[in-house]
């Protein structure tokens, strides 16, 4: 019996993540923080898009990964519920929903990485585009060609929510729909005018926006769901290792929007390795000893 308990206790904690820049960054931070606690860790970073990583967590193939509060709307099929557009409301809702599935949400980062739309700097300056109201006018004038993920185009909470809130419709012929959810691809397409694109789906904490001379359109009507990143862990794993909760709370408390943009930029723009960026950040904050 003692050997069984010991083997279970020392089984490596499997840390997963999505394949986007911020996912691999925050996944690396989780792994490093757990290793600093003296826990054995197996990394499965960059597993794939949301549904693949989520399924791995539910099946027990991984123990924890960084997820966004707003994705609870999609997990529960309640994208139109206005509660998801409030930071605290979204956190409480997803925590309650996932508790029934044997999952625990830990403390979230103070940064909203919601979906936004950014426009080429030259076009934005020439046409005076700064807000989604301005963007809607440009769409009506036939000026906009958008690069976005299939999920962004099709999800009721993404592009359709913008269209409803700002009274515009972007025809499919003026949308380049790309598989996956990597905004590094859509932002670069917009910046470089690939396939005639001059606007792209981005996230609020993307690190490449300034470097690519993209102007983010302000969502003044709060059309979008709040997406704050937090570790999600299997409840049985947390019961075995309760020290995970305070350790990761200290890590995620350091990740405000400006910090995430800077760290994401080091990876997406400067080409640094996510683990290196994560390790340096945690060391600078005194979280690795």
PLM segments and residue spans:
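Short, well-ordered beta-strand elements
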Residues: 10-22, 39-44, 142-147
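Short, polar/charged alpha-helical segment
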Residues: 21-40, 160, 164
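Beta->alpha turn/N-cap motifs
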Residues: 46-50, 60-73, 89-90, 149, ...
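Ligand-binding "clamshell"
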Residues: 76-106, 169, 194-197, 207-221
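A conserved helix-loop-strand patch within extracytoplasmic ligand-binding domains
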Residues: 88-146, 253-257
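A bilobed periplasmic-binding-protein/Venus flytrap-type ligand-binding module shared by bacterial periplasmic
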Residues: 115-125, 227-241
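Ligand-binding pocket segment of bilobal, Venus flytrap-like solute-binding proteins
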Residues: 141-219
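An extracytoplasmic/periplasmic, membrane-proximal ligand-sensing/linker region
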Residues: 153-168, 242-289
